[in-house]
């Protein structure tokens, strides 16, 4: 009887401490990416083509792996016009143009006559318009081997960060999960300010809820950008867990896009962006699911907690998977075996 009880207790402990994070295979991620592109881009953004003012959407489309050749002529004519009018000044916009050129097989040093590499190298790093654009600029500078530009951009970006409170790009309005995620992407790409990046991950977790990452409510955009932030670090277990939440709570099987209260096309574009980071670390087809660790970083108490949802059901913070049923099942099995053993002994 003691041996049976001990064995069952071991099983119960294994069940209670090993919650599976399913994540997705590369085929799963590609399928979600393809339907999202069809919804947000084929069905909306791509209908009128792209110019320099819509660089972000063409950049995301290029990141998805879609064929962008139908749009590049008009786009780079627009870039050339902006350059000729001295309007191509934001390093982020230049960075996106560089990445688009590379994706299309166009030389960034001669994109419709514009030397984008020189434009990025000579741009004023203080005129970057958003945390997103710091990432785009750093990504492009890194790809072009412009190490001094990468350093100048990351040094300027770091001035917006305070350890313990995060970023503030908005003159006192503070940080958000979206800004923290983009800060992480930029600094991870630059390979700079590791102390700030680690702090940003801790702060990002204060926005975690079981329904997704919350910015005045759980939403697809914040959850997707958190997925990108964990993916770029190669944190497969955490990325798998966030991916599961993103798909479960925000993917729309009917449209193939991602749900949002205000703009489903915008939310879907952010999801496509995030999936491009997750794809390299997603499971190979046929690979078995991994097992999430027993615990994850606990959310710290900050003012961000005011924005969280109040769902109090007990789930693993690593996966969002309910653990009570597993505990209950193990307990029932234990009692059943104990009763059977007692009856047999009698």
Task: List where the protein language model places each region.
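C-terminal low-complexity, Ser/Thr- and acidic/Pro-rich disordered "stalk" regions positioned immediately N-terminal
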Residues: 282-319
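Alpha-helical repeat scaffolds
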Residues: 34-40, 70-84, 110-125, 149-161, ...
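A cross-kingdom C-terminal cell-surface attachment/processing module
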Residues: 321-343
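Predominantly the C-terminal beta-signal and adjacent terminal strand-loop region
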Residues: 243-261
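Sec-dependent signal peptide cleavage junction
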Residues: 15-31, 312-323, 342
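Positively charged n-region of N-terminal signal peptides that target proteins for export
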Residues: 1-11, 341-346
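An alpha-helical repeat/solenoid feature that recognizes helix-turn-helix modules
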Residues: 43-68, 86-107, 126-150, 163-197, ...
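Terminal, non-catalytic domain-edge segments
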Residues: 23-35, 245, 260, 266-297
């Amino acid at each position: 009887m003691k041996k049976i009880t001990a064995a069952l207790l071991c099983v119960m402990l294994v069940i209670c401490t090993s919650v599976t994070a399913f994540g997705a295979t590369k085929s799963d991620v590609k399928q979600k990416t393809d339907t999202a592109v069809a919804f947000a881009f084929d069905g909306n953004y791509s209908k009128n083509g792209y110019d320099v003012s819509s660089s972000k959407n063409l950049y995301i489309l290029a990141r998805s792996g879609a064929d962008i050749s139908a749009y590049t002529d008009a786009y780079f004519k627009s870039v050339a016009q902006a350059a000729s009018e001295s309007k191509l000044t934001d390093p982020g916009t230049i960075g996106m143009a560089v990445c688009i050129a590379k994706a299309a097989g166009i030389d960034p040093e001669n994109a419709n006559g514009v030397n984008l590499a020189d434009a990025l190298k000579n741009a004023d790093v203080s005129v970057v318009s958003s945390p997103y654009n710091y990432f785009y600029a750093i990504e492009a500078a890194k790809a072009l081997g412009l190490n001094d530009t990468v350093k100048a951009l990351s040094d300027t970006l770091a001035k917006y960060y305070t350890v313990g409170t995060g970023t503030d790009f908005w003159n006192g309005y503070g940080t958000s999960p979206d800004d923290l995620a983009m800060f992480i992407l930029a600094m991870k790409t630059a390979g700079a300010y590791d102390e700030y990046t680690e702090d940003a991950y801790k702060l990002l977790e204060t926005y975690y809820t079981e329904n997704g990452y919350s910015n005045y409510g759980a939403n697809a955009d914040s959850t997707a950008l958190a997925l990108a932030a964990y993916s770029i670090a190669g944190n497969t277990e955490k990325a798998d867990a966030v991916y599961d939440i993103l798909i479960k709570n925000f993917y729309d099987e009917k449209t193939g896009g991602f749900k949002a209260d205000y703009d489903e096309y915008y939310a879907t574009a952010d999801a496509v962006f995030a999936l491009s980071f997750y794809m390299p670390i997603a499971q190979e087809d046929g690979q078995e699911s991994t097992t999430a660790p027993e615990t994850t970083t606990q959310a710290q108490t900050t003012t961000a907690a005011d924005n969280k949802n109040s769902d109090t059901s007990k789930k693993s913070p690593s996966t969002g998977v309910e653990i009570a049923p597993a505990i209950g099942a193990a307990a029932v099995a234990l009692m059943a075996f104990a009763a059977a053993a007692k009856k047999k002994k009698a």
